[in-house]
Amino acid sequence: MVNDLTPHFEDVQAHYDLSDDFFRLFLDPTQTYSCAHFEREDMTLEEAQIAKIDLALGKLGLQPGMTLLDIGCGWGATMRRAIAQYDVNVVGLTLSKNQAAHVQKSFDEMDTPLDRRVLLAGWEQFNEPVDRIVSIGAFEHFGHDRHADFFARAHKILPPDGVLLLHTITGLTRQQMVDHGLPLTLWLARFLKFIATEIFPGGQPPTIEMVEEQSAKTGFTLTRRQSLQPHYARTLDLWAEALQEHKSEAIAIQSEEVYERYMKYLTGCAKLFRVGYIDVNQFTLAK
């Protein structure tokens, strides 16, 4: 357990508050910034992102009137889908000012009696009881030293039949890379340092074992783990392709340096997923 549970606002805002207009250049219309799920080969990126959201929500056992907490809610696509498909109330947490403003605007435009809130806050600051929790692409930002606290908080606010769906990038230990026959190259070391310092400051993907062991210690039971590894390589390929197609706009919105940095990040990460250095998994955790 760590004593200071202040959310990592600065680390997250350094990436996600770059510019909504910039992210729109390469994300799909739902503005979902995580691995898509290509159920069919002919799916568009938008269709595959909705399929990923449906895959995650479908594992939660949602019932009308329940309250769903979305930790690291991004631009709100998962919550809007949950309202539309499951008639549930939603609460979203984000550390990004841009995302919070975008989600609030989209909520204000919805015609529904269901309760919908977005808070500029981290899970560390949230103590309300909820029925289900979904977290897609946020756990990587928490830091290894907060895993135990995160699972304890999730367990505390869920009911006896509660479910947490955790979708996160997962990494390998150095020994696991050796065991899998993956070379520990200078390019790999430099690229991982680049990601940690210039793209996702503070980011620390867990290993699969970390998630399973820490969640179990808190009282969660892993009922399913599903890897989407090849799907993330394809997602990143499509993001890189879209950003490249909008190069002049990207440079106008940000700069050539930012454009080149993001192209390096997107193409390099696609390679990591394709080769197998990193994975992405959905963990279904029952209380």
Curated annotation (Swiss-Prot):
Catalytic activity of the protein: a 1-acyl-2-(9Z)-enoyl-sn-glycero-3-phospholipid + S-adenosyl-L-methionine = a 1-acyl-2-(9-cyclopronane)-acyl-sn-glycero-3-phospholipid + S-adenosyl-L-homocysteine + H(+)
UniProt binding sites for S-adenosyl-L-methionine: 33-34, 72-74, 94-99, 123-124, 136
Alphabetically ordered keywords of this record: Lipid biosynthesis, Lipid metabolism, Methyltransferase, S-adenosyl-L-methionine, Transferase
Enzyme Commission number(s) of this protein: 2.1.1.79
NCBIfam families: mycolic_MTase (NF040660)
Reported function: Catalyzes the conversion of a double bond to a cis cyclopropane ring at the distal position of an alpha mycolic acid via the transfer of a methylene group from S-adenosyl-L-methionine. MmaA2 also catalyzes the biosynthesis of the cis-cyclopropanated methoxymycolates. Cyclopropanated mycolic acids are key factors participating in cell envelope permeability, host immunomodulation and persistence.
High-level lineage: Bacteria, Bacillati, Actinomycetota, Actinomycetes, Mycobacteriales
Active site: 269
GO MF terms held by the record: cyclopropane-fatty-acyl-phospholipid synthase activity; methyltransferase activity
Pathway: Lipid metabolism; mycolic acid biosynthesis
PANTHER family in the cross-refs: CYCLOPROPANE-FATTY-ACYL-PHOSPHOLIPID SYNTHASE
Gene Ontology biological-process entries: methylation; mycolic acid biosynthetic process
Superkingdom: Bacteria
KW Repressor (keyword) present: no
Family: Belongs to the CFA/CMAS family.
Keyword Acetylation (UniProt): no
Protein name: Cyclopropane mycolic acid synthase MmaA2
